Amino acid sequence: MQTSWQWHRRLLHNLATPEKSVLRLNLDETSIVLNHDGQKGVVTSSADNKVVLVNKKSKQRGTLTHVVLVCDDNEIQPLLPQMIIGNEHVLRVRDMNELAPDIPKNVFLVRAKSSWITVPLLIVLFEMLRKSLDAKNVTKHPVLLMDACPVHLHAHVWRAARRQRIYLCFVPASLTWLVQPLDVAIIRKLKAFVRAHYKRTQVQHATACVDLVHVVRILVRAIAKNSAGPDMEQCFRRLRLCCLWHWSQITDLVLLCKSWLSQHCRSR
């Protein structure tokens, strides 16, 4: 934790100048399930002619991966590239063609062998991020916060970040809940939005089977709501204060232990 925190502070101190400020970013991947049938309350019954869901579970299984990217500037947030990755056995070519008119310019729907993030896809995302910032003449220095998963730590990813003038900072796996805005404030709300609108689609279509195309459309709406929703700057600032508080508590505890050990050794 100490190394990560010092690294982050060093980057902010070295990059921030009167001419150029720092753009703090956070990237993380989250799994989006394609059905929510396992929860209570899906099947309903009624004596009148209202819409009723039948007791039939969806045969659709699998997940999509949403690569989420947020920053501490609400004006830049809608420009940031977002990626949705689907396994080629789940996300079919005809689904891609049907969804093409509904996908915003900053959202990239990817059909790949695996639904998880890979080094080549992350490099492409860095390239798209740089193009998005340059297209709007964003002069801030991007500092990207990521967890320490093997894909993020790959040498090719580091080189790609250097080419695109993106400064990387990593968070230990056990501390993402404390440091990353995505883990604390964003992803949970995004998944809740998808789950709620999945249920709403079931009611509207009078079926428990919601196809992949509808799930992707719901996710795209969730991404748009996320871009226009919470104050990202406040999220980053609150986490920074929280980290400072926790770090001060840890420092005080270490000093207290040292003092106790010193007194204990002298008494013996």
Report each predicted region and the residues it spans.
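Phosphate-facing sequence motifs and polybasic nucleic-acid/acidic-lipid-binding regions
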Residues: 1-266
